[in-house]
Amino acid sequence: MNVDRSSLSPMMMQYFEVKDKYPDHIVFFRLGDFYEMFFDDAVTVSRALELTLTGRDCGQAERAPMCGIPYHSAEIYIKKLIDLGFRVAICEQMEDPKLAKGIVKRDVIRIVTPGTLTESNLLDDSKNNFIGALYVHEGNAAICFADISTGTAELFTHKDKTAPELTEALINEISRFSPAELLFNAEAADMTEVREFIRTRMNLGVTVMKEEDFSPVHSDVLLKQFSADSFTDIGIDEKDACAVAVLCGLFYYISDTQRAAVGRFTEIQTYSDKRFMELDLTARRNLELCETMRNKEKRGSLLWVLDRTKTSMGKRLLKSYIEQPLIKPAAIIDRLDAVEELTSDMIRLSQLGDALDGVYDLERLMTRVMYKTANPRDLKALAQTALKMPDIKHLLADCRTSLIKGLCGKIHELSEISALVGNAINDDPPPLLKDGGVIKDGFNPELDRLRNIIKNGKSIIDDIENKEKERTGIKNLKIGYNRVFGYYIEVTKSYYDLVPAEYIRKQTIANAERFITDELKKAEEEISGASEHVLVLEAEIFAEVRDFIASKLAEVQETAQAVAALDVLCSFADVSMRNRYVKPDIAIDGVIDIKGGRHPVVELMTDELYVPNDTYLDTSSRRMAVITGPNMSGKSTYMRQTALIVLMAQIGCFVPADYAKISIVDRIFTRVGASDDLTAGQSTFMVEMSEVADILKHATKQSLVILDEVGRGTSTFDGISIATAVAEHIANTRKIGCKTMFATHYHELIGLEGRVDGVKNYSVAVKKYGDSIKFLRKIVEGGVDDSYGIEVAKLAGLPKNVINRAKEILSEMEREKAEGRKASADGQISFGALNDEEVLSRLRKTNPDEFSPADAKLFLQEICDMLK
């Protein structure tokens, strides 16, 4: 709204000076015990939060629109505004209003955005709250995700990628980290596919920052965040322009919003080299790693099964483990050995669980300490957690595996923190420092003296009164109090002649005079000022304790990381024992051999007895398993089960099987299920083909590919042709030759076995009872050419008349098919004739000079197969 500022009151002028600096933010303007909003902000917030819109005199004829919230409960309102897409500028009083001369000084102390929240009650303990920054320049890119609430920072760099490859990589990283907020440079903002993905799938805002915000001139701000002197100290190559730019831009933004260049972060994890299994968005979604496809819930996901963690830090790390399986055998074996050692002693595992159960979120507590927003209960939680560390180290003392020994060495006892907080902070302190009663009696002599004044104020006045009676001989002398004069000595007129000369007359009343003395005035000042002085001194002592804890950041951060890792390993051990998992053998010979494998989620969510199945895949004779069988028979579950067992092994967890030998895979690809991407204007078939194309482009010999019903979104002949061509391409060792599970209802693919090297047929066993069938859920060797579609429809509950009609139509079609074969034998046009034409077409296009002997043999075999 337009406001004539010429007649505004001084305070309103001050408000507009702040608002002009933050025109796109809601300004929380501190007035006493409230944060007030004025004019447009007031109207907006009153509607958004359903607050009463009032008014305040502002120096103009009309009152300024105003709404307010108590400052002590501001967090919940801030979170609501952030969730609605607003950003909030906190404008605080920078001096005591009682001591201010004129208008109280105010300034913005913090800007709250979705990615810069640090308050524990505003965040999900089990999830990181990432803010991401993307910098793109001339085809190269760097993207960094930081969680200021935990001090976590992860950097990815991309060089020499094609535009589609870069787009795919960035979308995968953004979807995996699921940031609360994103910062782009202008060139990044021009990547329309990335922006469209964020708009339609992520539902989060993007801030396009100026190019100068990413300038190396901000490197000092970046290095202060890491308490470092150079880029080398934080593991960054200064010549990597994109990496330097994205880090400078991101941490400049963090410093600007937090109004502090605090050394909260200790390291940057860099991922320019290949250290983890790659899982794209499709694989993470189809395998339901952290949430279900249907309801987006944790229950029913792999994370739900594996999460027996006790700490918030462990929960966040577990999610990271699941989304980033290892590919280095030594690292995987270290985790598996650690889990095995933990499962070997149930008593120790139980005691570790009890100890971890009392550990608070060290990472987020330390963030609030570093940003000076920690409250008394935060420090107490830190101290209580510190007290648990000696117990945890003692329980790990006898462990022999290298990983657990390493973690034990990184857990610091933090005894100085627990001792200082234990001595200084009351056992049950108030949540707010201003409430008083935070510092223990006996910790600070001056504080004890002030508290004694408050406690014994009446006694002090009584002592002065008795002393003055005795000194002056005025028997009816008494000390009183009122708000105007404070404490005073009252003497009746009959004793005027005994009043000492040093008494200072303050008031005359009927039949009496009131006086003050220097001693009484000093006592009054001590009594009335003691409460205020207590709060000031408590704040100073609290700040000293907090700053001491801040000096221990490196120790606390290392301890937090080690405790989180231990928590995840204990969770793996607990789940493995409860669910009868086995330790997998990790191999590099290309073999996946699973005996009695089970789906980790389905077996826990079904009331039926789960039917285990074996799986064998290698890189030679059994690269591809073609799986046929009816719908609903369990093909998809079986394939997902295999993928999840491989993934569980590579995150270092035991697996649901009787035995498992797992060779490392570099990627898991999935093409499972059908879901129209309507928001992107893509049909089921288009999505399916895009996913298949991605697999054919990126799969390597070390990959695991899961394909379910490829080609079903188009005509039968098109579908069969596409499915066959895809299977042949993947199975061909000169093209990909990776381990593949291919479920299909195209029974024509059964013919691949024997014709294409490395293909083996499997099917789901079915038992037929007259017109009914029973799914045995057992995978057996050999293909089947009956999909039992009508029987499945009957099980699904289709009406009897529809089932009967379907049987009639099926009989007619089978009869026509038989007659067609007879007509073909009589010389009529048939599919065989079409095959002949196809053979001739292939031969016409073939140049024998381009064939090697091996190629010629393979080509001749294909021609023979076509003529059969």
Predicted regions and their residues:
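ATPase nucleotide-binding head domains, primarily ABC-like/P-loop NTPase cores
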Residues: 39-42, 240, 310-311, 321, ...
